[in-house]
Amino acid sequence: MPDAPQDRRKWSVLSGLFLVYMASNGITLHTLPLLYPELIETFGWRASEVTLPATIFFIVGALTSPPAGWLLDRYSSRLIIALGGLLLCIGLVAYGMTQTLWQLVAVYALLGLALSLCGLVSNMVMLTSWFATGRGRATGILLMASSLGGALFPFIVGTGLEQSGWRTTVMLAGIGVGIVILGSAWLLLRDGRLASQKVALPPSLSPRGVGSLNAALKERRFYAIIFITGSLWFIIIALTQHQSIHLARDIGLSKTLLPAVFSLFFGSSVIGKLGFGLLSDRFDLHKVMAVSILLLAVALLLLAQLSALDRALLYLYAVMAGIGFSGTFTCIQLLVASHYSGSHYGRILAIVVLIDTLCGALG
């Protein structure tokens, strides 16, 4: 009975993290590209100029992840998430006031910094501090938020573009995102380090890597993890960024069918995130991760055999690729947490995210 309030609190924290991750990822990664045609029409910029700020966004986000990880290990993750949410709100409001390309580049740099403070690393640090057991299920639920944000925010912003124009829409979206993240930080999020320290874990559930960052950097295991996750991230980003071009241009798939394939792909990704999170709680994580990688590999083989006329094979690819990609992504987060959920977890995870992001950029 004494543990009941603690259990309720950790699920309340998870609900707050879900809202934060949905808002931060939903707007920055899945929605802002909708504004590219509006920017081209308003300013007469070339496509290469419009996408330049997004490149800066990913570079800044990657480079600021290690400092953010250091802050998360030393200070309140709740406070850092709130700071990231505030910067995200300011950046989106400034986006709506943009007049020149260099201003847009500066805005995207600010958004990259904001996401490094309130994005995946900070969410996983807080989640890991609360969920010593059932971490796979909790991680799967958290990562589902990105898929929900990817479905929700483009619809909302797309409606706003038609009714109010891009400037008003992006500023209102910024205010809304700020309210969601800051409200969640105030009402739902709580730092969990002290709470988790009160729980005496059995040896089988104790973190296997609680050393310092310096100790991790001397381990072959750490570099093996980076090689595995970096390689997988290269494949995942290459798949998600280029599959639409391949299906339409190389396979000859009708553009009217692309939305259905993508809906099936991302719908299956929700199943993959939760499903592989649950499986990792019941079975050996490394074996579960191997299954997710195998599914992804089979999906890639199917992709090489696709034709525009074989609808069944096309939909099978979408399901297997969605489940395989999302399951692998979930297992990557759990792999790092299972080995390094100690006092330097934030720093170690941030370095892994930095390497993975750079590998993804190559993809």
Identify the residue ranges that each predicted region occupies.
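Extracytoplasmic
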Residues: 12-47, 64-68, 153-154, 237-245, ...
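Hydrophobic core of transmembrane alpha-helices in multi-pass small-molecule transporters
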Residues: 22, 91, 102-118, 230, ...
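Extracytoplasmic gate region of multi-pass secondary transporters
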Residues: 28-39, 214-276, 363
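Intracellular juxtamembrane helix-capping segments at the cytosolic ends
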Residues: 39, 117-131, 327-340
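Conserved MFS/SLC helix-loop-helix module at the cytosolic interface between two early adjacent transmembrane helices
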Residues: 63-102, 280, 286
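A late C-terminal transmembrane helix in Major Facilitator Superfamily
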Residues: 141, 150, 325-326, 339-363
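Helix-loop-helix hairpin linking two adjacent transmembrane segments in secondary transporters
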Residues: 145-193
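C-terminal transmembrane helical hairpin of 12-TM major facilitator-type secondary transporters
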Residues: 257, 263-275, 280-335
